[in-house]
């Protein structure tokens, strides 16, 4: 049976790079949130600086995820799926903005539960250096990223219900490590949790 694996973490932790490498190794379909659909593109415009009510943005993320889940379920019929961000990003980022957890859970009620979530950790200053070359999104400020990092740890230490992945969470620290070392650590951790994932 094909597996659904999600990569999470603060901006600049190396999620996208590692998610793509793992997807390639597993012959999986790589996907991401926000998606590149119409709603996802609207979200990216807002993150780049357009004005939007925080609850409206939360609803847009949830609407984008409805379409994403449909695609994920279709893709899982033929291959593993690896996603760069998923519902956990919404929970952590939106709770950090002061949106109630109950509201976030309710609007994401249909979200498919992943088999495994890989949380990549990184020193905040190193993350900022990695992001220097990018255009800054509204969420990429140091103090905010610090709260996001805390939010992820609070989530994985308390989530034992609705969005608990089948094989749980794994945490990998990427600080001061080369890409290939991080990749090997992630792959070993995934295989340890799901031994039959590599055929």
UniProtKB/Swiss-Prot annotation:
Pfam family, one: Thymidylate_kin
Organism: Methanococcus maripaludis (strain DSM 14266 / JCM 13030 / NBRC 101832 / S2 / LL)
EC number: 2.7.4.9
Gene Ontology biological process terms in this record: dTDP biosynthetic process; dTTP biosynthetic process; dUDP biosynthetic process
Residue positions binding ATP: 9-16
Annotated PROSITE patterns: THYMIDYLATE_KINASE
GO cellular component: cytoplasm
Name of protein: Probable thymidylate kinase
CDD domains reported for this sequence: TMPK
Family: Belongs to the thymidylate kinase family.
Molecular function terms, GO-annotated: ATP binding; dTMP kinase activity
């Amino acid at each position: 049976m094909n597996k659904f694996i999600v990569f999470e973490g603060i901006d600049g932790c190396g999620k996208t790079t590692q998610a793509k490498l793992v997807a390639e190794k597993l012959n999986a379909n790589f996907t991401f949130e926000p998606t590149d659909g119409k709603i996802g593109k609207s979200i990216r415009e807002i993150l780049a600086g357009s004005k939007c009510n925080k609850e409206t943005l939360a609803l847009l993320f949830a609407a984008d995820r409805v379409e994403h889940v449909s695609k994920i379920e279709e893709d899982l019929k033929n291959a593993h799926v690896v996603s760069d961000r998923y519902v956990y990003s919404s929970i952590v980022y939106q709770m950090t903005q002061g949106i109630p957890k109950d509201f976030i859970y309710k609007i994401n009620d249909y979200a498919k539960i992943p088999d495994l979530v890989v949380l990549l950790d990184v020193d905040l200053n190193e993350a900022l250096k990695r992001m220097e070359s990018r255009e800054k999104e509204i969420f990429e400020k140091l103090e905010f990223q610090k709260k996001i990092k805390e939010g992820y740890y609070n989530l994985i230490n308390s989530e034992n219900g609705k969005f608990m992945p089948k094989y749980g969470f794994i945490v990998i620290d990427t600080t001061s490590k080369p890409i290939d070392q991080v990749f090997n650590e992630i792959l070993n951790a995934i295989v340890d949790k799901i031994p039959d994932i590599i055929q």
